[in-house]
């Protein structure tokens, strides 16, 4: 029995399903999860000592690779001064200033510890600001595991075939309206029917939790126009795509200004950190200034802030995002070319440092399109690549991530493995 198998069996005795986040269990793809022993750059090593090229990067945060020396030094520097204080620090101000500088739509920002906290708090704030209850989200978009957002959500729920979680009260779900992603007509109909009831529309401008699906400019511009017309708050959930699609996030890429933005992953540099922020007149409704309560013992944790601040400074290097986008596009286009050469139905897309792999002929534009993917063939591909030392997301419903640490050698090795995998899929 391998060390991975031994650890998984041991974990299942004390941890539900043996994991602390469902997608890690390999339930969709089958087999034994890889237990990570260490990581460096674009690689990690499992409990059996096998090395993998990592295209998950902790589900997005590791944009500069694992254990970047500058991030490591920043964390080591603050550790001797204390791990957590429950009181303000200068570093909190520094990271807030950095976020506001990089994302101009954010005039004020509040730090939290997870993406779920960020989206949950942003929605509460939008409801408090507008005095309305209804929220609008989109099918297949995942915004964390708050009750009102686990209605036709994406990510891990799709992996397990359950679009809506058990345990979500009907009285909570009734305030959530779910529309089709990229469907402008459905959006216009919803606002015509009950626009005056809508507190907020929350959207992933680049969805990464039903695999990678881009918002169309027409769709996102319609969102901005309709929310402004009806007095609803437009919330961009950029927990995944923030600082990764572009330095200023998807809102910079599309040239659209939301009212509130949720951030995470990259801003923690691998540590538990997230944030939400936006217009000052909305943010002023948060306690202690206003009546919308939000708090957190570990919000603005000094160790997490140090890692995040170091990462944000690294990604401002000239040409960083151009280089990241180029290598991610090369990966996606080359994988698609290898599949075509092998006669395997397949498509791929990339934007910034995110990519999507689909066992369909066309790149999807909605949740319905994503569900047409050949899941069985994806699962076979996943294991062929895993055996070759390439670690893609263990689900057909997750985006992948490239870091600045991925170089030509890692991309070449990935494509060599993919060539063999696609040939095996054709056989």
Swiss-Prot record:
Its cofactor is pyridoxal 5'-phosphate. It comes from Burkholderia pseudomallei (strain 668). It catalyses: (S)-4-amino-5-oxopentanoate = 5-aminolevulinate. This is Glutamate-1-semialdehyde 2,1-aminomutase. Belongs to the class-III pyridoxal-phosphate-dependent aminotransferase family. HemL subfamily. Disulfide bonds: none annotated. It is an enzyme of class 5 (isomerase). One of its GO terms (biological process) is protoporphyrinogen IX biosynthetic process. CDD domains: OAT_like. The modification N6-(pyridoxal phosphate)lysine is found at residue 265. Its main location: cytoplasm. The keyword Transit peptide does not apply. Homodimer. SUPFAM superfamilies: PLP-dependent transferases (SSF53383). Keywords: Cytoplasm, Isomerase, Porphyrin biosynthesis, Pyridoxal phosphate. It is found in: Cytoplasm.
């Amino acid at each position: 029995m391998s060390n991975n198998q031994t650890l998984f069996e041991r974990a299942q005795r004390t941890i539900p399903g043996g994991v602390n986040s469902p997608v890690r269990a390999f339930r969709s793809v089958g087999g034994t999860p890889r237990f990570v022993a260490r990581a460096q750059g674009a690689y990690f090593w499992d409990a059996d000592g096998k090395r993998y090229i990592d295209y998950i990067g902790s589900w997005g945060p590791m944009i500069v690779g694992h254990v970047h020396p500058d991030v490591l030094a920043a964390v080591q520097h603050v550790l001797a001064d204390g791990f957590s204080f429950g009181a303000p620090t200068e570093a909190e101000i520094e990271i807030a200033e950095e976020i506001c500088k990089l994302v101009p739509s954010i005039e004020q920002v509040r730090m939290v510890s997870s993406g779920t906290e960020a989206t949950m708090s942003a929605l509460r704030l939008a409801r408090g600001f507008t005095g309305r209850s209804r929220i609008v989200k989109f099918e297949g978009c995942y915004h964390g595991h708050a009750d009102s957002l686990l209605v036709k959500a994406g990510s891990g729920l799709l992996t397990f075939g359950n679009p809506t979680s058990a345990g979500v009260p009907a009285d909570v779900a009734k305030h959530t309206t779910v529309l089709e992603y990229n469907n402008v007509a459905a959006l216009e109909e919803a606002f015509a029917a009950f626009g005056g009831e809508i507190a907020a529309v929350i959207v992933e401008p680049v969805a990464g939790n039903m695999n990678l699906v881009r918002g169309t400019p027409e769709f996102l511009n319609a969102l901005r126009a309709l929310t402004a017309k009806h007095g609803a708050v437009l919330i961009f959930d950029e927990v995944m795509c923030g600082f990764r699609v572009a330095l200023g996030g998807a809102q910079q890429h599309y040239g659209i200004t939301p009212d509130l933005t949720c951030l995470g992953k990259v801003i923690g540099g691998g540590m538990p950190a997230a944030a939400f922020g936006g217009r000052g007149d909305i943010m002023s409704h948060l306690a202690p200034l206003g009546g919308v309560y939000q708090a957190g013992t570990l919000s603005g944790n000094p160790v997490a802030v140090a890692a995040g601040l170091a990462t944000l400074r690294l990604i401002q290097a000239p040409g960083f995002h151009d280089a990241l986008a180029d290598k991610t596009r090369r990966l996606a286009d080359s994988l698609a070319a290898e599949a075509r050469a092998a006669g395997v139905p397949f498509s791929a897309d990339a934007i910034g440092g995110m990519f999507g792999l689909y066992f369909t002929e066309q790149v999807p534009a909605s949740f319905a399109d994503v569900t047409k993917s050949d899941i069985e063939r994806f699962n076979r591909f996943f294991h062929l690549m895993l055996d070759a030392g390439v670690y893609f997301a263990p689900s057909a419903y997750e985006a992948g991530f490239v870091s600045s640490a991925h170089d030509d050698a890692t991309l070449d090795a990935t494509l060599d493995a993919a060539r063999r995998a696609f040939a095996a899929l054709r056989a």
